[in-house]
Amino acid sequence: MGNCCSDVASGAGATAGVGGSGSSAALGATNDALDYYLKSKGFNGLFSQIELSFSASNLRDRDVLSKSDPMVVVYQKEKDATLSEVFRSEVVLNSLAPKWIKKFIVAYHFETVQTLVFRVYDVDTKFQNSREEMLKLDEQQFLGEATCALSEIITKSTRTSTLELKRKDGFAPQAQPHHGKLIIHAEESLASKISTEIVFRCSNLESKDLFSKSDPFLVVSKIVEHGTPIPVSKTEVRKNDLNPIWKPVFLSVQQVGSKDSPVIIECSDFNSNGKHSLIGKVQKSLSDLEKLHLAGQGINFSLPTGAGQNKVLKSQLFVDKFTETVHHTFLEYLASGFELNFMVAIDFTASNGNPRLPDSLHYIDPSGRLNAYQRAIMDVGEVLQFYDSDKRFPAWGFGARPIDAPVSHCFNLNGSSSYSEVDGIQGIMTSYTSALFNVSLAGPTLFGPVINAAAMIASASLAQGSRKYYVLLIITDGVITDLQETKDALVSASDLPLSILIVGVGGADFKEMEILDADKGERLESSSGRLASRDIVQFVALRDVQYGEISVVQALLAELPSQFLTYMRIRNMKPIPP
């Protein structure tokens, strides 16, 4: 399954570069800069508020005259592997099977691996009247610990995980059979399911550009106590428009706190250098915006002045649409049995450099330091593997000449002629390293064949009624030479349960690649004039994020849940309760 073979004709016919139109490229760069600007200010992808409940069974009895008095403590593993305490339950007296009442509220972010460590302690009787947060843990008796990713809990059909408790030294439960079990149950908050659709319109905006009208966009930010407002949503940029109407903005109540929590709506004139000019801003709650819609009234923007006052402007903001609906969430689909299936395609063209030389993008460092391709595979794969039950991933290479064969633009990374799957992320890494020594780097850079191979798998799965959504990661160092063929493949694939993540490595000019990312411009159009039914591409240049606060995996995966939900809604597919 998933086998793809040499495409000699494509290779011979695509040796020259194919350029996009200047306007499309400019539009792509424009919104790419906007996305980077927002992410630098804290804008993240879809998230859900999760409530974790705890109980335990068969805990070890460490008290002589009574049963243990257990308390559970939760830690979050940070990037540097240190543990930060984030929660303590109450103490349950005299119980080896406690059911704690206190809940742990955590924000689930799909694009990161949120590793949690749970430790259970027997609280000494002499501390019975002390507040839990004042207890010194080194003065309590340790009963056992367990570790898991938050995604492992919420992807189970029952949203309940039973974890074996073990000693801190890592001894297996079989060696110490009396540590007991910790049961964790997850519930998604109702606020995660309430979606507000808002259509904003403005009138009489000030022109900030010298020779043209402003290019306005809106950013909606929530207000946090003692902190900088955090962006939670944005509109597209409207070119040369002083009376713009934007596409709908979707907000969940939890994103802003509550319906009565104030939000700041800023209207700015876009500049490609990232220095956007503020046109004006307003501060209102969702309830206020609903009232404006019902009354058909606008509200005037204001601008802060140097004297600490606000200057009221003639420019106004209107709410043309305001509707609230309870919708199915990403987590509801996962709990009902939907899976995300990971696939990867790796660029083996000669522009990567000789793999045996240290300056090659494909160089395998004997010290174990990962190259850019290995980092992208690990970073994305480590997140997505939790959503795939069998963890068998199709893996391809393109742009190379296998031994005694012509140049192939889609060959199985494992060397097989009949199947493309490998076992786990480590299987991809091993096959990638092996392939480097079994193929000759060639060219040109063609995406069409690997996209079509992924689309064939997604199409077959859809025909079988499988509850699977596929995610293809393409890692490349160069500009594609089959731009129109790639557009055709993407437009066709937009009807399938498939998203495509593209990572650009090295120093190439990736402007043409940004054209493929439809959220940075108009929808893709095929050579026959057909438009893509939805956006399925997310592109990130590794150099743009590797030194910032936003990781490549966050930048890539932030939009994936939204793409998944868009597909489900277009096809009217609903999660069937477990």
Swiss-Prot record:
Induction: Down-regulated by high temperature. Up-regulated by pathogen, calcium, low humidity, avirulence gene product avrRpt2 and salicylic acid. GO terms for biological process: defense response; positive regulation of cell size; response to humidity; response to temperature stimulus. Expressed in roots and flowers and, at higher levels, in leaves and stems. Strongly expressed in growing tissues. Not detected in green siliques. One of its GO terms (molecular function) is metal ion binding. A lipid is attached at G2 (N-myristoyl glycine). Ca(2+) binds at D63, D69, D122, D124. Pfam families: C2, Copine. It is found in: Cell membrane. Its main location: membrane. GO terms for cellular component: plasma membrane; plasmodesma; plastid. Disruption phenotype: Dwarf, twisted leaves and enhanced disease resistance in cv. Columbia when grown at 22 degrees Celsius. No visible phenotype when grown at 28 degrees Celsius, or in cv. Landsberg erecta, cv. No-0, and cv. Wassilewskija at any temperature. Humidity and temperature sensitive lesion mimic phenotype, accelerated hypersensitive response (HR) and increased disease resistance. Bon1 and bon2 double mutants, as well as bon1 and bon3 double mutants are seedling-lethal when grown at 22 degrees Celsius. bon1, bon2 and bon3 triple mutant is seedling-lethal at any temperature. Based on mass spectrometry analysis, the N-peptide must be modified and there might be additional modifications other than myristoylation. Changing D69A: No effect. Loss of function. Loss of function, but no effect on targeting. Residues 341-560 form the VWFA domain. Keywords: Calcium, Cell membrane, Lipoprotein, Membrane, Metal-binding, Myristate, Plant defense, Repeat. Disulfide bonds: none annotated. It is a lipid-anchor. Negative regulator of cell death and defense responses. Negative regulator of several R genes, including SNC1. May have effects in promoting growth and development. May function in membrane trafficking and in fusion of vesicles with plasma membrane at low temperature. Exhibits calcium-dependent phospholipid binding properties. This is Protein BONZAI 1. It comes from Arabidopsis thaliana.
